[in-house]
Design a protein with these regions (language model features):
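N-terminal Rossmann-like dinucleotide-binding module
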Residues: 1-41
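Small/polar loops that bind or transfer phosphate-bearing groups
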Residues: 7-11, 35, 57-58, 81-85
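A general structural signal for well-ordered alpha-helical segments in protein cores
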Residues: 16, 43-44, 66, 118, ...
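Short amphipathic alpha-helical segments
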Residues: 19-21, 45-47, 93-96, 115
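Short, surface-exposed acidic-centric catalytic microdomains
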Residues: 26-68
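Hydrophobic beta-strand scaffold residues
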Residues: 30, 53-55, 80, 101, ...
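Donor/substrate-binding cores of folate-linked one-carbon enzymes
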Residues: 36, 82-201, 205-213
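Short, well-structured alpha-helical segments in soluble
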Residues: 67-77
């Protein structure tokens, strides 16, 4: 496995850990997990057990944080950087990994750009919610969409409930997306939209459709 991937995490790191556990199956080599100070304390031991480099960035002034993140990412020779990050990434890092950095956003972009997307979805009374994996560009949550998943909301359903429903689709979608990148199937058309070569589009709840079967 020569497709080298780095992960930047602010919370529990469930998606990153799942990718590391399934690395051989999806054809990636996890190289580094960079954790914000808010990230789960168990991530370091998990990375140690799985022979993945680990860096925790303490609470720092913004300029110092950006510098530490940049140094930690660029020190590695990475093919792809995956963000499940609460912070906006500095333009210098976005430029360095242009076209090779993706983000997981808990909403159906271009709706609910920015923070607290699930809470805002609940407050507006939408009937459907979901998650988006997209390319990272300097403008927040404005990069080309790679994949999306969709769930319907029940009567008076709270965001923590439909957030759990979303995650059931988000995890396999995330793993499959890494596999698409690793196998060189992701490309851009003349309008700058991202597509996956030979993938099946138009289905629900995930588009493009998942090709690898992952255990529940």
């Amino acid at each position: 496995m020569s497709f080298k991937v780095g992960f930047c995490v602010s919370g529990k790191g469930r998606l990153a850990m799942s990718a590391i556990r399934n690395a051989q199956r999806i054809g990636i080599k996890p190289c580094i997990l960079i954790a914000e100070h808010t990230a789960d304390q168990l991530l370091e031991s998990f990375c140690c057990e799985n022979e993945v480099n680990f860096v925790r960035i303490p609470k720092l002034p913004r300029v110092d944080f950006d510098q530490k993140l940049y140094e930690s990412c660029t020190k590695q020779v990475l093919d792809l950087v995956c963000l499940t990050f609460d912070k906006i990434v500095a333009p210098r890092l976005v430029e360095y990994y242009k076209g090779r950095i993706i983000n997981v956003h808990p909403a159906l972009l271009p709706a609910f750009i920015g923070t607290k997307a699930l809470e805002r979805a609940e407050s507006t009374g939408v009937r459907f919610a979901g998650a988006t994996i997209h390319e990272v560009v300097e403008e927040v949550d404005a990069g080309a969409i790679v994949a999306q998943c969709l769930v319907s909301l029940g009567y008076m359903e709270k965001y923590n409930s439909f957030g759990s429903k979303i995650y059931k689709h988000l995890e396999p979608m995330f793993l499959q997306t890494l596999n698409w990148y690793a196998t060189g199937r992701v490309f851009k058309d003349e309008k700058g939209r991202i597509w996956v070569r030979n993938a099946v589009y138009g289905g629900i709840p995930i588009s493009p459709e998942i090709e690898i079967k992952f255990p529940e």
